[in-house]
Amino acid sequence: MSEAGTPEAPIKKKRPPVKEEDLKGARGSLSKNQEIKSKTYQVMRDYEQAGSAAPSIFSRNRTGTETVFEKPKEGPAKSVFG
């Protein structure tokens, strides 16, 4: 037990050494039996199964189906500078 004026030093615990073979086994089993639940991954997989490339966010040829919140605007894109 410590006295009122002396702070106790925290006890530092050392980690056990990690073997390279343990790391290899852990990396392989991280997502072994888990389905990826990302919307981006789902869209990419759907386009891949359809045999086409997924639309890019940088493409000017959007269809309006890439996002639910924004529909394509009529006419050419306006400049942000003028």
Curated annotation (Swiss-Prot):
Superkingdom classification of source: Eukaryota
Location of this chain's protein in the cell: Nucleus; Cytoplasm; Secreted, Extracellular space
Chain ranges for the short sequence motif Nuclear localization signal as given in the UniProt record: 10-18
Residues with the Phosphoserine modification: S2
Pfam families, alphabetized: Mustang (PF15682)
InterPro entries: MUSTN1
Cysteine disulfide partners in this protein: none
GO cellular component terms, semicolon-separated: cytoplasm; extracellular region; nucleoplasm; nucleus
Region (Disordered): 1-37, 51-82
Alphabetized UniProt keyword annotations: Chondrogenesis, Cytoplasm, Myogenesis, Nucleus, Phosphoprotein, Secreted
Residue(s) carrying Phosphothreonine: T6
The UniProt record lists the keyword Phosphoprotein: yes
Record GO biological process: chondrocyte differentiation; chondrocyte proliferation; embryonic limb morphogenesis; glucose homeostasis; muscle organ development; positive regulation of chondrocyte differentiation; positive regulation of chondrocyte proliferation; positive regulation of gene expression
Tissue: Expressed specifically in the musculoskeletal system (skeletal muscle and tendon). Highly expressed during bone regeneration, especially during the early phases (post fracure days 3 and 5). Expression within the fracture callus is localized in osteoprogenitor cells of the periosteum, proliferating chondrocytes, and young active osteoblasts.
Job of this protein: Required for chondrocyte development and proliferation. Plays a role in myoblast differentiation and fusion. Modulates skeletal muscle extracellular matrix composition. Plays a role in skeletal muscle function. Plays a role in glucose homeostasis.
UniProt similarity note: Belongs to the MUSTN1 family.
Protein name in the entry: Musculoskeletal embryonic nuclear protein 1
Organism: Rattus norvegicus (Rat)
